[in-house]
Amino acid sequence: MYSFTRCKVSSCPRYATHISEYCLAHDPRQDLAPTLSFPVLDSASLSNWNCTEEDFSGKRILGSLFSYSTFHGVSFVKTTILNSNFSFCLFEECVFDESTIRYVIFSGSTFTQCMFMNSSITHTNFNGSIITRCDLTG
């Protein structure tokens, strides 16, 4: 599920993936782009990651760790997010329309101008989150 082993690169604050001593960004055997292109992200660990204008539409994000990350202009349209950790993240102008979000931790995160129209959000932790100018209708 979650790896609590730090990346082998001494200056990196991220956690190592479950199949490596490195985080996904520093693993010499992996390129981040092909990994993010898969329709399923399972046990990904990208803490303290800066994600700008990526398209995660229709993906399944399972058991992954993205805490302390920044997401700007990211599309999560029709995405299924299960049992994942987005604690203390910043979400700006992200779209989660028609997504299924279950057993996810968003505690301490900030959401600004995000859309969650017609999304199903259950058993999810938003404790301490700041939600500003977002649309959660439907």
Region locations from a protein language model:
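Tandem repeat scaffolds
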Residues: 1-20, 28-138
